[in-house]
């Protein structure tokens, strides 16, 4: 197989579940780093990185650790979405703890239920790797039948080495954590400066009034 054929073969399938994109029409999603994944794998990844049940507004590429920013849209049925657009339909109410693999380790790209099903007439081929994990949404009556819609933007940034040990914290939380000490130091400096200015003003007023008071007493 030539080098061009090898690149074309690797780019036509999801690097996580190895399903061919041509078998899942409209299911491919491209991150800002250029890596392409199927819709299901990205949604499972988002579900596994939730914090306090909230889906993060950033998505870290499992391959290159590049951060892609997401924007939230109004909730709609996944069947009403344009499958060719850069959207992710994340179901509401699914458990946030990912299942264990055969070795007892957590797999962030595995989930017990699907996030999206192909439209009628575009079913997965028999024996496909991701078919065993597909559960119809009809079998989950206790879960809300709605989804959070996120749009994959073209903007992103590399993930720093100091942030790689905190995959479950969003960039917003990291920025807030870094800004908190700065805000505290700035407030402390402003308080000290205000106290010093007040003290100087009081001393100046006393120094200006005291001679007049002494002069009035001496004349009296």
From Swiss-Prot:
Q: Where in the cell is it found?
A: Membrane
What Pfam families does this protein's entry cite? Answer: zf-RING_UBOX (PF13445)
Q: Where is this region: Disordered?
A: 108-136
Residues annotated as transmembrane: 196-216
Which Gene3D superfamilies does the record match to this protein?
Zinc/RING finger domain, C3HC4 (zinc finger)
Checking InterPro entries in the record gives: RNF222, Znf-RING_euk, Znf_RING, Znf_RING/FYVE/PHD, Znf_RING_CS
Q: What are the boundaries of the RING-type zinc fingers?
A: 14-65
- This protein's major location comes to membrane
Q: Which PROSITE patterns match?
A: ZF_RING_1, ZF_RING_2
Membrane topology of the entry: Single-pass membrane protein
Quote the cellular component terms of the Gene Ontology held in the record. Answer: membrane
MF annotations from Gene Ontology: zinc ion binding
Q: Which UniProt keywords apply?
A: Membrane, Metal-binding, Transmembrane, Transmembrane helix, Zinc, Zinc-finger
Where along the chain is composition biased (Pro residues)?
Answer: 116-128
Q: What is this protein called?
A: RING finger protein 222
Organism (species): Homo sapiens
């Amino acid at each position: 197989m030539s080098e061009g054929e090898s690149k074309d073969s690797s780019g036509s399938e999801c690097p996580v579940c190895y399903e061919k994109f041509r078998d899942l029409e409209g299911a491919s999603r491209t991150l800002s780093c250029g890596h392409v994944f199927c819709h299901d794998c990205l949604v499972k990844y988002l579900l596994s990185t939730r914090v306090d049940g909230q889906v993060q507004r950033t998505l870290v590429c499992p391959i290159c650790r590049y951060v892609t920013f997401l924007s939230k849209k109004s909730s709609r049925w996944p069947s009403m979405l344009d499958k060719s657009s850069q959207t992710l339909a994340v179901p509401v109410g699914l458990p946030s703890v990912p299942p264990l693999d055969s070795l007892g380790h957590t797999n962030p790209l595995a989930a017990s239920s699907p996030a999206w099903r192909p439209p009628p007439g575009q079913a997965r081929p028999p024996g496909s790797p991701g078919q065993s994990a597909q559960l119809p949404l009809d079998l989950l009556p206790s879960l809300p039948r709605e989804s959070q819609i996120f749009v994959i933007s073209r903007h992103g940034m590399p993930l720093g080495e100091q942030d790689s040990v905190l995959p479950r914290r969003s960039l917003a939380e990291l920025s807030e954590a870094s800004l908190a000490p700065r805000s505290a130091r700035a407030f402390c400096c402003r308080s000290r400066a205000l106290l010093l200015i007040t003290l100087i003003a009081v001393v100046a007023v006393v120094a200006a009034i005291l001679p007049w008071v002494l002069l009035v007493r001496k004349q009296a």
